[in-house]
Curated annotation (Swiss-Prot):
HAMAP family noted in UniProt: ClpS
Upper lineage: Bacteria, Pseudomonadati, Pseudomonadota, Gammaproteobacteria, Pseudomonadales
Record protein name field: ATP-dependent Clp protease adapter protein ClpS
PANTHER family: ATP-DEPENDENT CLP PROTEASE ADAPTER PROTEIN CLPS, ATP-DEPENDENT CLP PROTEASE ADAPTER PROTEIN CLPS1, CHLOROPLASTIC
Quaternary structure, from the entry: Binds to the N-terminal domain of the chaperone ClpA.
Region (Disordered) residue spans: 1-25
Origin species: Pseudomonas putida (strain W619)
Function recorded in the entry: Involved in the modulation of the specificity of the ClpAP-mediated ATP-dependent protein degradation.
Pfam families per UniProt: ClpS
Amino acid sequence: MHARSEIRLTFNQDRPQSNEDDGSGLAVQEAKPILQAPPMYKVVLFNDDYTPMDFVVEVLETFFSLNRELATKIMLTVHTEGRAVCGLFTRDIAETKAMQVNQYARESQHPLLCEIEKDG
């Protein structure tokens, strides 16, 4: 004769949910995580005396997905005020866009400068 052993596994989801007091005198409430928006960074283009205006418009259309009208408006702001904000992004995206613009400008032999600044 063989003795038969039976093992029963109980998982948390199998236990009946009870909202009753367990007698410990403690009330437990799950804390909701506090979420904050990530800090935002401005991507800024700076004016120089050598980069053609058409190239600046091309950069704004290519790397910031701006339409021709808005790209031209920002390019004119860069030209007249010395700098302009191209967009507001999280740090990683802002750094990537600035790096791409600077690399493309160097490859095209233009001194156009793009940097990021913390917003606020």
